[in-house]
Amino acid sequence: MNILMLSSTFPYPPTRGGTQVRTFNLLKYLSQRHTVTLATQREGDVTDAEIAGLRDCVDHLAIFERPPDSATTGILQKIQRFGRFLQQGTPPSVLNRYSVEMQTWIDSWVEAGKCDVITCEHSVNEIYIQSHFQKQLKTIVNVHSSVYATCRNQLATGISENSLRDKINLPLLRRYEQNYCAKFSAIVATTEEDKIQLQEFNPNSEITVIPNGVDLVSFPNRTTDLGGHRLIFIGAMDNLANIDAVCFFSNEVLPEIQKLYPDTTFDIVGSHPVPAVLALDQKPGINVIGRVPSMVEYLHQATICVVPMRTGFGIKNKTLEAMAAGVPVVASDRGLEGLAVDGASHTLRALRANKPAEYVTAISQLFDHPHLRLELSHNGRQLVETEFTWDIAGKSYEQVCLGKE
């Protein structure tokens, strides 16, 4: 089978963020069994060595320059993009990454009959799919998270960067998601929650849930519990949901924990920390570490991994990676989305918390009880091994591509 995968995000190395992790690992699985062509965009910090590394993973690699970021474009262009959003329904964030050169190449590749399947790795790539493609080949969109549900959730939780803009955008995003899904023969979501949201827009659509996975070689189970009072958060630190999570935890939870356990530290590990995150480094016990060569080394040194997400839909790689590494997890409903970790009918695999007092209680329990840490460590790792590997996800994705889901 000849597969054309589209990813405006350069997916290598698969340590930069959640989009890269999911895209690369599904690509890696498919390329072992099929002929895979990847069309992607090169961002400013992508090195020639990284391009060579990605090229080794596919049969054909087509790279295009990423268009200038909207932050560097003029106000007139931004107004034009918003006008197009109102008229045609395509959000400025999608138009911002649109490459005419990439579109021309994709059109030619499809018209020449060089692929049997075309996949969009993240919904932002839907812009390259012409409505008539469905007549020629199977079209798949891999929705990492519903843009409408995410915007609605950010407004509901009060963490929107611009609430007036997002209130205007919300009905437009609903229309956008409904319209773009109609161009695809199959839709993939990461959680049942997202599937329900997307099914509401497109009752007749074929929607398959394929959760994220973990590379168990890159995230081995830790051999010892070092104890102590070390907390960690992992994730790309230019992501709005992650920024909100660490700011919320640092300001509203950590000071209360430190009253009970004064030596508590909080490591924030992940690439591209923005000024709001860097400023947290001035607070007692907080270490903003940035990008590291090995995330698992930092996880293994931690007592607990916290995932205090208040927004952001879809399954969280950070939660799965911590579980794979054998680190006990305390997380919010958003951080545990798509995972059966607690409740009467499930083995206890993580502790759930949403309010500051709930975090204090859960973290205190784990600090004080090594046997509880061991229980979560064992059960979390077992869950990942049996349900959340990239091999399992890759097989499911292959079935969707083959039309056998």
Model-found features: residue ranges?
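Acidic donor-binding loop of glycosyltransferase active sites
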Residues: 185, 285, 300-314, 325-327
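Carbohydrate-associated surface elements
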Residues: 193, 210-213
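Acidic anion/phosphate-binding donor-loop and adjacent secondary structure
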Residues: 151-152, 199, 214-228
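Short hydrophobic beta-strand element within catalytic cores of glycosyltransferases
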Residues: 318-321, 328-335
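A short, well-ordered alpha-helix in the C-terminal region of glycosyltransferases
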Residues: 365, 372-386, 396-399
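Acceptor-binding helix/loop patch of EC 2.4 sugar-transfer enzymes
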Residues: 8, 72-95, 139-178, 236
